[in-house]
C-alpha cells in the first residue's frame, strides 16, 4: 500500500468494525481511520507506572462487543515492546472473542536484536486468522516521503476484501522500485 496508513484505512473500510479499541498512548492514525469508518472508539489508558506497556487492563477491555484492536509493537510513541508471551496471550484472547487484531510493526526494525526476538509474529502469522500485521519500508529503510507499506494476513478471503478497498494504481513506480531495491 501507499504507506501503512493507507492500509489501516483499507482495513476499516473492508471490515466495517462497529467498536475499535485503541490503547493510549498510541499513533494518532488509528483514531483517524476509526473515525473515517464511523466506528465507536474505546480508549484503554495504559498505566504510566508500567511504562505504558499493555497488560491485564487491555485484555479486560477486549470483550465480545469489540470488533477490532489497533496496537503498535513497539508502541508509537513510547517505544515499549510487547513480549512474546503477552502477544500470544493477547492474540489468543482476541481469537476467542472474535476480535480482529491489527499489529503495527512499522518500527520493529529499530528493536535491538538481543531483546526477546521481537519479530516472531511474522513467522506465526498462519496460526492467527484474526491477525493483520503491518510494516512499512518508509521507517525501516529511512525513506521519508516514499509511501510504501505492506500488510500480512493468513486469511486469503480477508486479504482480498482489503485489497479491493485500495485504489487501482496506489503505488508510484518510484516507490515500487525502491521497495524492490530494499528487498534485495
What are these regions (language model features)?
Residues 2, 24, 73, 110, ...:
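Glycine-rich, N-terminal phosphate-binding loop of Rossmann-like dinucleotide-binding domains
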Residues 1, 44, 134:
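Hydrophobic residues at beta-strand termini and immediately following loops
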Residues 11-14, 33, 113, 137, ...:
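Residue-level signal for well-ordered alpha-helical positions
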Residues 6, 10-71:
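PLP-dependent aminotransferase-like
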Amino acid at each position: 500500500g501507499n504507506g501503512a496508513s493507507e492500509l489501516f484505512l483499507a482495513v476499516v473500510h473492508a471490515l466495517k468494525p462497529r467498536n475499535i479499541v485503541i490503547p493510549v498512548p498510541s499513533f494518532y492514525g488509528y483514531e483517524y481511520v476509526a473515525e473515517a469508518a464511523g466506528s465507536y472508539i474505546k480508549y484503554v489508558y495504559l498505566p504510566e507506572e508500567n511504562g505504558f506497556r499493555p497488560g491485564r487492563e487491555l485484555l479486560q477491555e477486549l470483550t465480545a462487543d469489540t470488533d477490532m484492536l489497533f496496537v503498535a509493537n513497539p508502541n508509537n510513541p513510547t517505544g515499549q515492546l510487547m513480549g512474546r508471551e503477552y502477544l500470544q496471550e493477547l492474540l489468543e484472547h482476541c481469537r476467542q472473542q472474535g476480535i480482529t487484531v491489527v499489529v503495527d510493526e512499522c518500527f520493529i526494525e529499530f528493536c535491538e536484536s538481543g531483546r526477546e526476538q521481537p519479530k516472531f509474529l511474522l513467522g506465526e502469522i498462519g496460526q492467527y486468522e484474526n491477525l493483520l500485521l503491518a510494516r512499512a519500508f518508509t521507517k525501516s529503510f529511512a525513506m521519508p516521503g516514499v509511501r510504501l507499506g505492506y500488510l500480512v494476513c493468513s486469511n486469503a478471503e480477508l486479504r482480498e476484501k482489503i485489497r479491493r478497498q485500495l485504489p487501482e494504481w496506489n503505488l508510484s513506480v518510484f516507490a515500487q522500485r525502491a521497495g524492490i531495491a530494499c528487498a534485495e
